[in-house]
Amino acid sequence: MKNKTKIIISGALGRMGKILIKETKKNKLIKLVYALINNNIDIKNHNQFYKVKEKKKFITLNNLKKKKKILKFDTIIDFSSPKYSIKIIKYCLKNNKKIVLGTTGFNTEQIKIINNASKKIPIIYSPNFSIGINIIYKILKNISKILGKNSDIEIIESHHRNKIDAPSGTALQLGKIISKSMKWNFKKSAIFSRYGNIGIRKKKRIGFSTIREGNTIGEHTVLFSNKYEKISIFHKAIHRSVFAKGALKAAIWISRKKNGLYNMSDMLKKIKI
C-alpha cells in the first residue's frame, strides 16, 4: 500500500467536517491526524457523532500552534468561514503545509491573501468539490462559445436556509466561466437583482437567481435561451459526501504538487470532454 496522505480537518464540527471525518475512515489512502475546532465549542455537545478514540484527535488552532514538535502531516482541508480560513492559511504558510480550501464568501482582500499565499505553498481552492459540477465547468466553456452570443443566460441556485453567502460560490464560478469564454467583463455582465421597471433585457448579461429554503444541499441550473430553443444544464448534490470525497481526492493530489493556486479543473485535466 502507498504511503497515506496525512491530513488535518478544519471546521471539524460543521456540516462538512463531520462528513469528512466519516469519509476518512473509508479512504485507505488518507490518515486523519487532527480535527480542528473553535475555542468556544464544547465537544460534549457532539458526543453522539464521535467515539472516544476520535475525540482524542480534536484540537483548537491555538493549541495546535503551541505544539513545539513538528507535526507530521501533509495537508489541511478547510471548510469553515472566510475569517477562520485566513487563520488556517497563515498557519500553513508558517509551517509550510498544503491546503485544500472549500470555504466560500471571501472578499477581495481575502482573495489577495490566498493568491499571495499560493506563491509559497500549494493551495487547491474550489467553491465546489463535486466531480460532477467540475465536469460541468469544462462543458460550459464550449457551450458558452457556441450559444452565448445569441442567448439569454440565467443561473439559478438553491441551497439550505442556513447558507450565509449569496449567490453561491459555485453560481459565481459558473458565471465567471461563461463571461471568460465570451470575453465579457463579469462585473458588468452579472445581474444580481431585478426589481421594478427594469426595461428590456440588455445584451451581454448573465442573470442570477438565489433560493434559500429547507435543507437543500445544492442545486444549480444554467439556462441558455434564444428564440428557437432553450438549453438547461442542471446539477443536484444528493448528499454532502460528494463534496467530501472530492476534497479527499484533492488532498491526495495536492500533496504531490509544487507551490501554486490550483482548482479542481487542474486536477481533472486528464478527463477529455
Swiss-Prot record:
Keyword NADP listed: yes
Gene3D superfamilies: Dihydrodipicolinate Reductase, domain 2, NAD(P)-binding Rossmann-like Domain
Localization per record: Cytoplasm
Alphabetical list of Pfam families matching this protein: DapB_C (PF05173), DapB_N (PF01113)
GO CC terms: cytosol
Pathway(s) annotated for this protein in UniProt: Amino-acid biosynthesis; L-lysine biosynthesis via DAP pathway; (S)-tetrahydrodipicolinate from L-aspartate: step 4/4
List of residues binding (S)-2,3,4,5-tetrahydrodipicolinate: H160, G169, T170
GO biological process terms on file: diaminopimelate biosynthetic process; lysine biosynthetic process via diaminopimelate
Keyword Repressor: no
Residues of the active site: H159 (proton donor/acceptor), K163 (proton donor)
EC number(s) stated in the UniProt entry for this protein: 1.17.1.8
SUPFAM superfamilies from the UniProt entry: Glyceraldehyde-3-phosphate dehydrogenase-like, C-terminal domain, NAD(P)-binding Rossmann-fold domains
Keyword entries, A-Z: Amino-acid biosynthesis, Cytoplasm, Diaminopimelate biosynthesis, Lysine biosynthesis, NAD, NADP, Oxidoreductase
Listed CDD domains: DHDPR_N
Residues binding NAD(+), per UniProt: G11, A12, L13, G14, R15, M16, G102, T103, T104, S126, P127, N128, F129
Catalysed reaction equations from the record: (S)-2,3,4,5-tetrahydrodipicolinate + NAD(+) + H2O = (2S,4S)-4-hydroxy-2,3,4,5-tetrahydrodipicolinate + NADH + H(+); (S)-2,3,4,5-tetrahydrodipicolinate + NADP(+) + H2O = (2S,4S)-4-hydroxy-2,3,4,5-tetrahydrodipicolinate + NADPH + H(+)
Predominant cellular place of this UniProt entry's protein: cytoplasm
Gene Ontology molecular-function annotations: 4-hydroxy-tetrahydrodipicolinate reductase; NAD binding; NADP binding; oxidoreductase activity, acting on CH or CH2 groups, NAD or NADP as acceptor
Subunit structure: Homotetramer.
Protein's job: Catalyzes the conversion of 4-hydroxy-tetrahydrodipicolinate (HTPA) to tetrahydrodipicolinate.
Family in the record: Belongs to the DapB family.
Protein's name according to its UniProt entry: 4-hydroxy-tetrahydrodipicolinate reductase
Source taxonomy: Bacteria, Pseudomonadati, Pseudomonadota, Gammaproteobacteria, Enterobacterales
